[in-house]
């Protein structure tokens, strides 16, 4: 029972976090030579690409929470 509540809460927080994250872009100076992108820049680019799927991810999390309540609720 407690594990169900913990898992339900985790998925709820996950759904909220996915729907509300904002990414800060690093300021680029036009006079500075371009260098290799850092790991942080690559992660930021990946999260920017994943941002298009955030509504689907949030709905998926809510669907999984519903299934947990239906199939594993007492």
UniProtKB/Swiss-Prot annotation:
Which family does the UniProt entry place this protein in? Belongs to the SMIM7 family.
Keywords in alphabetical order:
Membrane, Transmembrane, Transmembrane helix
Entries under InterPro entries matching the protein: SMIM7
Source taxonomy lineage? Eukaryota, Metazoa, Ecdysozoa, Arthropoda, Chelicerata
Q: What is its main location?
A: membrane
TM stretches of this protein? 53-73
* Compartments, record wording: Membrane
Superkingdom of origin organism: Eukaryota
**What are the disulfide bonds?**
none
Cellular component GO terms, alphabetical? membrane
Q: How does it sit in the membrane?
A: Single-pass membrane protein
Asked if the keyword Transmembrane belongs to this entry, the reply reads yes
Instruction: Note the PANTHER family from the entry.
Output: SMALL INTEGRAL MEMBRANE PROTEIN 7 (PTHR28622:SF1)
What name does UniProt use for this protein? Protein SMIM7 homolog
- Statement: the UniProt record of this protein carries the keyword Membrane: yes
């Amino acid at each position: 029972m407690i594990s169900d509540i913990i898992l339900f809460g985790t998925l709820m927080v996950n759904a909220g976090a996915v729907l509300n994250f904002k990414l800060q872009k690093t300021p680029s100076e036009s006079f500075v030579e371009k260098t290799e992108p850092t790991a942080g820049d690559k992660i930021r680019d990946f999260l920017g690409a994943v941002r298009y799927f955030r509504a689907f991810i949030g709905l998926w999390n809510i669907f999984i929470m519903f299934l947990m309540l239906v199939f594993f609720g007492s």
